[in-house]
Curated annotation (Swiss-Prot):
InterPro entries: Archaeoflavo_AfpA, Flavin_trans-like, Flavoprotein
Organism of this sequence: Methanocaldococcus jannaschii (strain ATCC 43067 / DSM 2661 / JAL-1 / JCM 10045 / NBRC 100440)
Protein name per its UniProtKB record: Uncharacterized protein MJ0730
Family in the record: To M.jannaschii MJ0208.
One GO BP: coenzyme A biosynthetic process
SUPFAM superfamilies: Homo-oligomeric flavin-containing Cys decarboxylases, HFCD (SSF52507)
One cellular component term from this protein's GO annotations in UniProt: phosphopantothenoylcysteine decarboxylase complex
Length: 186
């Protein structure tokens, strides 16, 4: 069984889509998924009325207390998880990771996972120039205009060893399938 640590940041952009995809993949591939939320993710997830959805589907939601609590780093480094998925990732989280700042649960866990060669996958919606259409609570559409600095930070992530940037929520399934194949060969 594939074991995934799923980090959620305070990014509302594409959050409903990511949650739906993770629910589908968990059931389709019988995944073992533990969710770790940043402090702001808790606020945003509740604003989108997705807290109960996550709790019903994934049971145990762990919310950041500080950069080391809950102790995700230890679980990543001791092999409890096959991969660390951060989706969606805020522009702030992306910038911190791009510049080596590890002062939150998610950014510290990414840094430490990389040091232990645990595969890290990050979906930052701000990943290319132009616009992104997202859905707000109440199904209202919002067009976001990407800032050059955010796109540049995503490009920095793409060049980092140990991180794979996902361009869209649908890319998560490709990652899952790749790791399922690896597990079969072990």
């Amino acid at each position: 069984m594939l074991k995934i640590a799923w980090g959620i940041t305070g990014c509302g952009d594409k959050l409903p889509e990511v949650v739906e995809i993770m629910k589908k993949l968990k059931n389709k591939y019988n995944l073992d998924v533990d969710i770790y939320l940043s402090k702001n993710a808790k606020i945003v997830v509740k604003w989108y009325k997705l807290w109960q959805v996550l709790e019903d589907e994934f049971y145990d939601l762990r919310v950041e207390v500080n950069a080391n609590a809950p102790f995700l780093v230890g679980k990543l480094q001791t092999g409890k998880y096959d991969l660390f998925l951060v989706a969606p990732a805020t522009a702030n989280t992306t910038a911190k990771i791009a510049y080596g700042i590890a002062d939150t649960l998610i950014t510290n866990s990414v840094a430490q996972a990389m040091k232990a060669k645990v595969p890290v996958y990050i979906f930052p919606p701000d990943n290319k120039k132009g616009t992104v259409e997202t859905i707000l609570p109440g199904n209202k559409k919002l067009t976001l205009y990407m800032r050059d600095v955010d796109v540049e930070n995503v490009e920095r992530l793409r060049r980092m060893e140990g991180i794979e940037v996902l361009d869209k929520p649908e890319d998560i399934e490709k990652v899952i399938l790749k790791h399922i194949e690896v597990k079969k060969q072990q």
